[in-house]
């Protein structure tokens, strides 16, 4: 009873922190000047991380097993993993764009957990026989950590694509505007003044330089985080194969979850291969990562909606 009450309190605290965090995050998107609000949002993510840690420990204590037996618990662990990834750049006081991705991911996932959509799974239950194994913690934790890192890395790639394509659209619109303004007497007079030419050129070159630097950093950090996630995913799949052989007598059964996990692994293996090819630009790799981002959510949520296969114990119904 004490554990249940404690979990209930921690759930409400995390929900409150997430609600405040979402509000602050939306305000900072429109008002960049308020730095204090952004710092509050960052600290809110850390508070959420502590609450989620308390939730996981509490569920572990009164259920007697590591809390990764259904979708609700795995989402809790996913938001905890996002918060862990968020902690590293936060403690180093750098890479604010990485923290923006991880904090928004934590807020979104924890908001989904506390929204009531998965209320049927919030009550801890006795593990089904297939899950009563020491491999549960190893396999599922590695898979979820892999998903978290791959999702964060993919979102950085999506940000890279947005910046790149916005730049391409601006260049295209500027070319059209230049052709239109070339016949304007006022525009010609403005361009002929040396001071205006220097100011305009220096502003554009400085802006392009910082944009290029940002694209480079997004590309580098995306590659690093995806590489880490790929290692976790590989360990998770291999440990799952060993567990499957012990439980069902076969390393691989090609049920929906296993099939989509393999597709996810293949997609990010292709991504890492493109990183080794000097002929591939960062945009091409980012497109592969974006496709991988979609595939992860199909593997994580889409397969659970089917409710079939050897992994159907983690499924849920939307009714």
Curated annotation (Swiss-Prot):
Topology relative to the membrane: Multi-pass membrane protein
Biological processes annotated in GO: cytochrome complex assembly
Keywords, alphabetical: Chloroplast, Cytochrome c-type biogenesis, Membrane, Plastid, Thylakoid, Transmembrane, Transmembrane helix
Keyword Cell wall biogenesis/degradation (UniProt): no
GO CC entries: chloroplast thylakoid membrane; plasma membrane
One Gene Ontology molecular-function label: heme binding
Subcellular compartments: Plastid, Chloroplast thylakoid membrane
Keyword tRNA processing: no
Record-annotated membrane-spanning stretches: 9-29, 44-64, 71-91, 143-163, 225-245, 259-273, 286-306
Family: Belongs to the CcmF/CycK/Ccl1/NrfE/CcsA family.
Self-association state and partner proteins as the record states: May interact with Ccs1.
Known function: Required during biogenesis of c-type cytochromes (cytochrome c6 and cytochrome f) at the step of heme attachment.
Protein name per the record: Cytochrome c biogenesis protein CcsA
Organism the protein comes from: Oenothera argillicola (Appalachian evening primrose)
Encoding gene, per UniProt annotation: ccsA
């Amino acid at each position: 009873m004490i554990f249940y009450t404690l979990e209930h309190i921690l759930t409400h605290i995390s929900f409150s922190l997430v609600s405040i965090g979402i509000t602050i995050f939306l305000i900072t998107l429109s008002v960049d000047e308020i730095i204090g609000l952004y710092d509050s949002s960052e600290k809110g993510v850390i508070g959420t991380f502590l609450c989620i840690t308390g939730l996981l420990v509490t569920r572990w204590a009164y259920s007697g097993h590591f809390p990764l037996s259904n979708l609700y618990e795995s989402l809790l662990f996913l938001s905890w993993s996002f918060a862990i990834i968020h902690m590293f750049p936060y403690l180093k006081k750098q890479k604010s764009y990485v923290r923006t991705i991880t904090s928004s991911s934590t807020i979104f996932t924890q908001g989904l957990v506390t929204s009531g959509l998965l209320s049927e799974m919030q009550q801890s239950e006795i593990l089904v026989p297939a899950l009563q194994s020491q491999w549960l913690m190893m396999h599922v934790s590695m898979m979820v950590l892999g998903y978290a890192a791959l999702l964060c890395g993919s979102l950085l790639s999506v940000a890279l694509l947005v910046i790149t394509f916005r730049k391409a659209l601006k260049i295209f619109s500027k070319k059209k505007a230049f052709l239109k303004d070339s016949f304007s007497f006022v525009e010609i007079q403005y361009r002929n003044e040396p001071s205006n030419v220097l100011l305009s050129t220096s502003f554009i070159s400085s802006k392009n330089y910082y944009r290029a630097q940002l694209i480079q950093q997004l590309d580098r950090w995306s590659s690093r985080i995806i590489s880490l996630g790929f290692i976790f995913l590989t360990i998770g799949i291999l440990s799952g194969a060993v567990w499957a052989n012990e439980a069902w007598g076969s390393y691989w059964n090609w049920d929906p979850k296993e099939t989509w996990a393999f597709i996810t692994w293949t997609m990010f293996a292709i991504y890492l291969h493109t990183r080794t090819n000097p002929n591939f630009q960062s945009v091409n790799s980012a497109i592969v990562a974006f496709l991988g981002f979609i595939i992860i959510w199909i593997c994580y949520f889409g397969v659970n909606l089917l409710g079939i296969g050897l992994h159907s114990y983690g499924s849920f119904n939307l009714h």
